[in-house]
């Protein structure tokens, strides 16, 4: 099994996906978080499934979360994609 297949399998687990996104967010580089969220979306059925579940346009998701990780999703799109992936954003004191 290659790394991408292993990661995709792990990202189906809510706790692992939450930890993965938390670590990506701590990098403070938006492209890292955007790429990580794309990995989670792909592992959970892909952009088409998340678009349907989140009532988002597929085109807007493909633009917001390109494979390169260089998308620039709006907060609305990012929160909707997280919810449609079964996750939510939370905050805690540093």
Tell me what each language-model feature is.
Residues 34-53:
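Short basic helix-loop element that most often maps to the first helix and adjoining turn
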